[in-house]
Amino acid sequence: MAKEKFERNKPHVNVGTIGHVDHGKTTLTAALTRVCSEVFGSARVDFDKIDSAPEEKARGITINTAHVEYDSNIRHYAHVDCPGHADYVKNMITGAAQMDGAILVCSAADGPMPQTREHILLSRQVGVPYIVVFLNKADMVDDAELLELVEMEVRDLLSTYDFPGDDTPIIIGSALMALNGQDDNEMGTTAVKRLVETLDTYIPEPERAIDKPFLMPIEDVFSISGRGTVVTGRVERGIVRIQEEVEIVGLRDTQKTTCTGVEMFRKLLDEGRAGENCGVLLRGTKRDDVERGQVLVKPGTVKPHTKFTAEVYVLSKEEGGRHTPFFKGYRPQFYFRTTDVTGNCELPEGVEMVMPGDNIQMTVTLIKTIAMEDGLRFAIREGGRTVGAGVVAKVIE
């Protein structure tokens, strides 16, 4: 059978289910594919297939993730669902599957539980911009007041972590009913349809990488006699055009220069775009003025920083990480984009040590500046071996 052509005519949005174990994330994921296949004609995926999620490697970390796709009237959704709590932690911190919005699944019968809270906190830390709530198993709750109470609890919890709790859409229903094609009191199929319509309206269309301000991590520097200095790398976002000013940020004082040429596969171009590997010729910049690990950016868009708070996952021994815990004052290398910089770790109040396999918030102070923004991913390494993964939660200075 020939592969179907990937339709580019609908905007593409990445979502995922989050929430406490056994509250119905995977059932809802399967129900979404079923309802969308009937209403909008996308493919249906069964529960068992999603539940036995394949292993993936992201930054050397093993993560089990199931990817499904479904369509609404106006969009194409790529949806991630993880079987275990540890998989969520790793997934969100490494950014293996970055979400434009999350569906928080909470059982109406149980209310918010520890992982409900933890997933909301993680979403805040790693920069998931929007959360929509599906209050599941509502067919098991006869008391309308109880439903209202759970809804209030969820709203309070969202507000605690700086999400707009009062304005967050909450859909009440039963994923299992929808999966089985039932719809008593509009709690099954109708509720899931309502959820998809909510995703369409509440989660804005993500800005495409090409529309964001230009940024290219520098991987290599060459000097070409008679032409000047060329830096190479893969354009992360935006577009660089000839004769535009750019800044070189990180590791040293920020320098301004001008792009005088863009080359790709030995061909001269007028511009380099997001996703392309290219060489950028810099006017008046000497070979020794630039090094791997710096970034080329649109002037004024990204600043160099040394201190930030981060959410970090520490690899377990089985994943090839450390065999022993670390303590405050730990000084590993932080690998940002293309280079390592040594940094000092401050642990939260009352935390004495961090065990392999833990996730932890920490404050890091680097010995050199790095071009960084909230949401930037990094690896933690010791002598070239990855021992952790993290994301910048908030830049401090």
UniProtKB/Swiss-Prot annotation:
Q: Does the keyword Hydrolase apply?
A: yes
Q: Where is this region: G2?
A: 60-64
Give binding positions for GTP.
Answer: 19-26, 81-85, 136-139
Q: Which residues form the tr-type G domain?
A: 10-207
UniProt catalytic activity: GTP + H2O = GDP + phosphate + H(+)
Provide the residue span(s) of the region labelled G4. Answer: 136-139
Task: Give the EC class as a word.
Answer: hydrolase
Segments of this protein annotated with the region G5: 174-176
The protein's location, in the record's own words, is: Cytoplasm
Would I find GTP-binding among this entry's keywords? yes
Xref: PANTHER family: ELONGATION FACTOR TU, MITOCHONDRIAL (PTHR43721:SF22), ELONGATION FACTOR TU-RELATED (PTHR43721)
Q: What does this protein do?
A: GTP hydrolase that promotes the GTP-dependent binding of aminoacyl-tRNA to the A-site of ribosomes during protein biosynthesis.
Whom does it interact with, and what assembly results? Monomer.
Family, as annotated: Belongs to the TRAFAC class translation factor GTPase superfamily. Classic translation factor GTPase family. EF-Tu/EF-1A subfamily.
The protein's matches in HAMAP family, at most eight in alphabetical order, are given as: EF_Tu_B (MF_00118_B)
What's the protein here called?
A: Elongation factor Tu
What does UniProt list as this organism's lineage? Bacteria, Pseudomonadati, Pseudomonadota, Gammaproteobacteria, Pseudomonadales
